[in-house]
Amino acid sequence: MQLNPSEISELIKSRISELGVDSQVRNEGTVISVTDGICRVHGLSGVMQGEMLEFPNNTIGLALNLERDSVGAVVLGEYTHIKEGDPVKCTGRILEVPVGPELLGRVVSVLGQPIDGKGPINTKLTDFIEKVAPGVIARQSVSQPVQTGLKAIDAMVPIGRGQRELIIGDRQTGKTAVAVDAIINQKGKGVYCVYVAIGQKASTIANVVRKLTENGAIDYTIVVAASASESAAMQYLSAYAGCTMGEYFRDRGEDALIVYDDLTKQAVAYRQISLLLRRPPGREAYPGDVFYLHSRLLERAARVNAEYVEKFTNGAVKGKTGSLTALPIIETQAGDVSAFVPTNVISITDGQIFLETDLFNAGVRPAINAGISVSRVGGTAQTKVIKKLSGGIRTDLAQYRELAAFAQFASDLDEATRKQLERGRRVTELCKQAQYKPLQVWEMAASLYAVNNGFFDDLEVKNVLAFEKGLQDHLKSKYADLVARIEATKDLSKDDEAALRAAVEDYKRSASF
């Protein structure tokens, strides 16, 4: 039998074409070890820093350490089923979370999954968890206020839209209470809020959610929860996830407020991951890049100009600036603000509200130390009427604290010193405020006006808050036009000032407090 070479080659070609083998090039590696949520993977030569990795059972990991012969990855979620020899694939993607108005009113995990039992969230968009902060040219100076509704803050340490204001203090000094009050006070002001709970007890988070719901604040708030039972990786990523959700509003010409509660626990989680990845420890065993951990997060809070918003939205939104205001919380140990993480965050932020244990225990709540609490944005972002009336409050309080310490040792005090001490006691009393009871601008203005003009000087200290409450009720019932004008203009004209003085004098004569 004679074989024709051309027939043989044709036969081989047809067989090859029928095979239909698809060749896929894939970057794949093998698990060498897995301990405490950290996987060492051999291979993956083309992996990128921060890239998502796919483990068996659709488990996701994050490549953090790129070494010569292995990759150190942190597993997001359950890792007990991963074993030595398991295959690991590169995804070529960076971690993303869902964003959009659909998240408002919901409690979500770090990766944007609903955990409040209210059904699925149908978001249309996702965005990267790590993003570069807006540049200098894209920013606009901070000039609009974020009213917290707390007299002590709005009068002495005003916060502006796009500012980063640190809330710092020991445990149990009311840090979360200040932040939650600020969120509650944004009702009807067009500010969307994000509350990021990092490493807290689940019961504490549930309590915050309940309070927000009771006060009607949950409708414009996203709660991102990474409780103490979550892995260190989730606690570390939670702040960035919340920031991305807040940036959605900022970049579209809206105003947003984000609370990180608290960044000390985030730094501890990052330290845990870094030590498990065998990175060299530095001061207090934190890794060398713990400053960058917080600076790249807090720099994303900014006020962006109208050009940036217009360019981002492809011309859909014109003439509107956007802002993301950050209220990071730091917990200190025995008032030590010179520890590593507190000093880092103080140097990054635009001011700090310092809460003191001694003041808290003395019944001054919020327990704000007026002497060392500052806002580096200052009066530029303050409401006109509050700016006009709050000038003397801070100095009165600072001088009072100084004199009070001195007066303990002095037996006979001159008249001027005694007057200053008496005034200081009344101003301190006036700065006290009940939790979840933020004040409107006109209420604050009335209180500040009364204390500045000496209407409290002849009252007993214990009657100060009762007088304030009575004055507010009196103004609301008999001077509704004046109240409406102050609230609308956020200013105090000469005529309104005269009317306010007459109203306060009228109330004081009635002596119904």
UniProtKB/Swiss-Prot annotation:
GO CC terms: plasma membrane; proton-transporting ATP synthase complex
Pfam families: ATP-synt_ab, ATP-synt_ab_C, ATP-synt_ab_N
Coiled coil (UniProt feature): none
Membrane topology: Peripheral membrane protein
CDD domains the record matches: ATP-synt_F1_alpha_C, ATP-synt_F1_alpha_N, F1-ATPase_alpha_CD
Stored SUPFAM superfamilies: C-terminal domain of alpha and beta subunits of F1 ATP synthase, N-terminal domain of alpha and beta subunits of F1 ATP synthase, P-loop containing nucleoside triphosphate hydrolases
Keywords carried by this UniProt record: ATP synthesis, ATP-binding, Cell inner membrane, Cell membrane, CF(1), Hydrogen ion transport, Ion transport, Membrane, Nucleotide-binding, Translocase, Transport
UniProt GO MF annotations: ADP binding; ATP binding; proton-transporting ATP synthase activity, rotational mechanism
Residues the record marks as site: Required for activity: 373
Reaction equation(s) it catalyzes: ATP + H2O + 4 H(+)(in) = ADP + phosphate + 5 H(+)(out)
Catalytic activity, EC: 7.1.2.2
Location of this chain's protein in the cell: Cell inner membrane
Positions contributing to ATP binding: 169-176
Predominant localisation class: membrane
Family membership: Belongs to the ATPase alpha/beta chains family.
Assembly notes: F-type ATPases have 2 components, CF(1) - the catalytic core - and CF(0) - the membrane proton channel. CF(1) has five subunits: alpha(3), beta(3), gamma(1), delta(1), epsilon(1). CF(0) has three main subunits: a(1), b(2) and c(9-12). The alpha and beta chains form an alternating ring which encloses part of the gamma chain. CF(1) is attached to CF(0) by a central stalk formed by the gamma and epsilon chains, while a peripheral stalk is formed by the delta and b chains.
Role description: Produces ATP from ADP in the presence of a proton gradient across the membrane. The alpha chain is a regulatory subunit.
Protein name, as recorded: ATP synthase subunit alpha
Organism: Polynucleobacter necessarius subsp. necessarius (strain STIR1)
Gene transcribed to yield this protein: atpA
